[in-house]
């Protein structure tokens, strides 16, 4: 979903950078965030720290994870938006296919994004748990 249907880079970048700042690390750029997305929250944290060539204990990374998640779950769809043309594409595909979404984002957050983006209407009802 993220990176294919929804441009969520800005919301992920904000959550990531707030987390890095909170724990005393340097933030990353919009360009750099592209290389960390797709591995989940812990993957984002690990890659962000690796970019800076710094190490953190597992306990520190867990604290960062919880901080990131507590912010992100409240701000999962602030700057995110469907990519141009996605709604029209889904509308056309919906006529001949049953559509579903696969995401490594938590189910609860996926549902919020689908609802707020107005993409839920294009999915097969059985695919939205």
Model-based region annotation:
Residues 22-52, 58:
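Alpha-helical substrate-recognition element adjacent to the catalytic core
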Residues 16, 20, 37, 41-45, ...:
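Hydrophobic alpha-helical core bundles mediating ligand binding, dimerization, or RNAP-core interactions
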Residues 50-87:
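Metal-dependent phosphoesterase signature
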Residues 1-35:
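Active-site neighborhood of HAD-like aspartate-dependent phosphohydrolases
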Residues 128-129:
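Conserved small/polar residues in nucleotide/adenosyl-binding loops
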Residues 36, 40, 81-85, 105:
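Short beta->alpha linker loops
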Residues 26, 55, 119-124:
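Conserved H-loop
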Residues 86-114:
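Substrate-recognition element of Asp-dependent hydrolases with the DxDx(T/V) motif
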């Amino acid at each position: 979903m993220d990176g294919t249907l929804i441009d969520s880079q800005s919301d992920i970048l904000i959550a990531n950078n707030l987390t890095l700042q909170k724990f005393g690390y340097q933030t990353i750029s919009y360009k750099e965030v592209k290389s960390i997305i797709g591995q989940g929250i812990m993957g984002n944290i690990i890659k962000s720290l690796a970019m800076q060539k710094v190490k953190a204990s597992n306990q520190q990374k867990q604290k960062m994870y919880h901080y990131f998640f507590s912010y992100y779950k409240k701000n999962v769809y602030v700057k995110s938006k469907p990519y141009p043309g996605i709604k029209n594409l889904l509308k056309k595909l919906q006529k001949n296919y049953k559509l579903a979404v696969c995401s490594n984002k938590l189910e609860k957050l996926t549902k919020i994004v689908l609802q707020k983006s107005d993409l839920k209407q294009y999915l097969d009802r059985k695919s939205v748990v």
